[in-house]
């Protein structure tokens, strides 16, 4: 039996409102949609950064992806969505041992959020008086095994960025207060969006995103008309619009599931490894994270397309999104990093 794709957006009061805009109904923005799908196939890619103009569907695409994601198995009531009882943190009070299927967590990290809201809060008085580890889990606990979404991530406060960097590197959240220590797994796909006109992202956080995509407003009339038409139809009757696009959304979900099964079997021949290395050397990228992300993304694309091995075409397709945000700025090159990668790909991998 097929699981319905619809997922309702919670309102500020907690009430459920209309369903999210379907992923398959988003017009254009193919690079952005592909980058999000690749992280759904292989979360180990490391997340997606989407920078671009306002009103280009950045937030819509992220929330639409959430409705597509396959469910996960987790212990009922576990605050970190542990897959089995043995992995439940010792501080968590979980009354059930049942393993249930639940939606993949997608958690918003709002601007201006406090540190305790992100990492969780310790009740020191209760710990001292009763000897109990009283811990209120934060957003990182909720995001474990799912997605953490940051809109306008370039406006995040520095101390929150530092927290995210530490957790993204270790995969574990550690909260220490007055000699007490709490820890729990915090492995999630980081998805950030923002407008470059509002400020740059710190290089340390920028490098933690596996893929980076630039989105622009469509420049041709036909595309803009189609965007208007679909949005107007959705606003008039969201449920009917969702039903119309449900089959295509279900096709995409099935593609994700099938690609996940194929992924471990996709081979990376030596020619692909040499292509990765040659391209990164030509671009002058620092370290090896670029090559590793490039190869991993190409493998996910191959799995998504049903291929058995990574080919040059796969590498060329994902090179810009995997490498453009890792380049040093060249003040003499006015074309920008995206154009530099595209140009170098054509020269190095003809």
From Swiss-Prot:
Residues where ATP binds: 52-59
One of the record's GO molecular function terms: ATP binding
Domain of life: Bacteria
Its EC number(s): 6.6.1.1
Pathway: Porphyrin-containing compound metabolism; bacteriochlorophyll biosynthesis
Keyword Nucleotide-binding: yes
Keyword Ligase carried by entry: yes
Keywords: ATP-binding, Bacteriochlorophyll biosynthesis, Chlorophyll biosynthesis, Ligase, Nucleotide-binding, Photosynthesis
Biological process according to GO: bacteriochlorophyll biosynthetic process; photosynthesis
Catalytic activity: protoporphyrin IX + Mg(2+) + ATP + H2O = Mg-protoporphyrin IX + ADP + phosphate + 3 H(+)
Entry's family note: Belongs to the Mg-chelatase subunits D/I family.
Function: Involved in bacteriochlorophyll biosynthesis; introduces a magnesium ion into protoporphyrin IX to yield Mg-protoporphyrin IX.
Protein name: Magnesium-chelatase 38 kDa subunit
Organism of this sequence: Rhodobacter capsulatus (strain ATCC BAA-309 / NBRC 16581 / SB1003)
Encoding gene (name): bchI
């Amino acid at each position: 039996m097929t699981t319905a794709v619809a997922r309702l957006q919670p309102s500020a009061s907690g009430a459920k409102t209309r369903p999210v805009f379907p992923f398959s109904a988003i017009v254009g923005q193919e690079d952005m949609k592909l980058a999000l799908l690749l992280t759904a196939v292989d979360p180990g890619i490391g997340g997606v950064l989407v920078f671009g103009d306002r009103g280009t569907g950045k937030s819509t695409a992220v929330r639409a992806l959430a409705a597509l994601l396959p469910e996960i198995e987790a212990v009922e009531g576990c605050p970190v969505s542990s897959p089995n009882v043995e992995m439940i943190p010792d501080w968590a009070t979980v009354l059930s041992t049942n393993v249930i299927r639940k939606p993949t967590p997608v958690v918003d990290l709002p601007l201006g959020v406090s540190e305790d809201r992100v990492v969780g809060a310790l009740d020191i008085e209760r710990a001292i008086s009763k000897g109990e580890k009283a811990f209120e889990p934060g957003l990182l606990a909720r995001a474990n095994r799912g997605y953490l979404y940051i809109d306008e991530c370039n406006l995040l406060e520095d101390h929150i960025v530092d927290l995210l960097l530490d957790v993204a590197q270790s995969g574990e959240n550690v909260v220490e207060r007055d000699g007490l220590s709490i820890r729990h797994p915090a492995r999630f796909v980081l998805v950030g969006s923002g407008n470059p006109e509002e400020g740059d992202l710190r290089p340390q956080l920028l490098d933690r995103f596996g893929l980076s995509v630039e989105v622009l407003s469509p420049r041709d009339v036909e595309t803009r008309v189609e965007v208007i038409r679909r949005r107007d139809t959705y606003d008039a009757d969201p449920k009917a619009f969702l039903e119309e696009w449900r089959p295509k959304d279900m096709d995409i979900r099935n593609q994700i599931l099938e690609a996940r099964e194929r992924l471990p079997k996709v081979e990376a021949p030596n020619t692909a490894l040499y292509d990765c290395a040659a391209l990164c050397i030509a671009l002058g990228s620092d370290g090896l994270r670029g090559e590793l992300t490039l190869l991993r993304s190409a493998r996910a694309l191959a799995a998504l397309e049903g291929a058995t091995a990574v080919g040059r075409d796969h590498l060329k397709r994902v090179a810009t999104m995997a490498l453009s945000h890792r380049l040093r700025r060249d003040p003499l090159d006015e074309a920008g990093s995206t154009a530099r990668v595209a140009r170098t790909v054509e020269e190095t991998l003809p």
